């Protein structure tokens, strides 16, 4: 309780008006704690997908952008020959490679085209964290026609939110509307799954607003479904 109070005080000093988290619905002690401390069910859905044996279903991409709820991280060499359908699909669609600092301007441009807002500071912070925070970077950019056509920013969580098993969390995924029908989002997820398999990560999850039907539909077509985890929010005055 005291720690939560300290967190709320810090949040208020920094202009933050709500605290978000999530928990397994079977963790009754944690749910009881959230109930006693004023948390409510959030308006977001936590969805996930098994990496091993998962299936990326091909289809046209639209304006997709995941919410800003985590941070990003990690990097692999994709030079090895294609070993499965995910990798073949990813390479056939576009040139998908590790996110690099020089991609920042393109990421901010794509985000602005999708959201209609200037979130360059937020994107800069995510890219900076992706470059420095972890030895395992799984954030990717898709290049097509000489420019960045889309990106996915993800991290590997070990122990966050009370978990004991490692899981990959997608922070943000965005596709330039000019490449909406080029399968960029599918290619990004395909390569992400390849990389996670190499890291022996068995699940990937993300959080999506329940009103974002386009993004939910995209993830559901890619094999995602409802998670055992529920999103909670506490609004602070």
Give, region by region, the residue ranges found by the protein language model:
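Conserved acetyl-CoA-binding loop-helix of GNAT-fold acetyltransferases
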Residues: 1-9, 32-36, 175, 181-194, ...
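Acetyl-CoA-dependent GNAT
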Residues: 4, 98-102, 112-165, 171
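Conserved GNAT acetyl-CoA-binding A-motif
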Residues: 11-23, 196-208
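Conserved beta-strand-loop-alpha-helix junction that forms the acyl-donor binding cleft
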Residues: 21-30, 52, 206-215, 233-237
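A short, internal acetyl-CoA/4′-phosphopantetheine-binding micro-motif in the GNAT/acyltransferase core
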Residues: 23-24, 170-180, 208
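Short glycine-/small-residue motifs
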Residues: 44, 150-151, 229
């Amino acid at each position: 309780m005291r720690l939560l109070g300290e967190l709320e005080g810090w949040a208020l000093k920094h202009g933050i008006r709500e605290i978000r988290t999530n928990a397994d619905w079977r963790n009754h002690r944690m749910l009881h704690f959230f109930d006693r401390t004023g948390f409510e069910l959030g308006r977001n859905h936590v969805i996930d997908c098994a990496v091993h044996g998962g299936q990326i279903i091909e289809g046209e991409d639209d304006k997709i952008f995941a919410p800003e709820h985590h941070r990003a991280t990690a990097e692999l060499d994709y030079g090895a020959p294609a070993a499965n359908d995910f990798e073949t699909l990813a390479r056939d669609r576009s040139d998908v490679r590790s996110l690099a600092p020089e991609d920042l301007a393109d990421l901010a441009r794509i985000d602005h085209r999708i959201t209609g807002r200037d979130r360059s500071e937020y994107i800069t912070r995510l890219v900076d964290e992706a470059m420095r925070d972890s030895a395992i970077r799984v954030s990717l950019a898709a290049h097509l026609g000489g420019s960045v056509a889309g990106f996915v920013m993800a991290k590997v969580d070990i122990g966050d939110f009370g978990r004991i098993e490692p899981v990959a969390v997608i922070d943000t995924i965005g596709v330039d509307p000019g490449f909406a029908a080029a399968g960029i989002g599918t290619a990004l997820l395909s390569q992400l799954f390849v990389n996670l398999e190499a890291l022996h990560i068995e699940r990937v999850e993300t959080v999506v607003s329940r009103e974002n039907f386009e993004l939910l539909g995209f993830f559901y077509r890619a094999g995602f479904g409802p998670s055992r985890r529920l999103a909670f929010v506490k609004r602070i005055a």
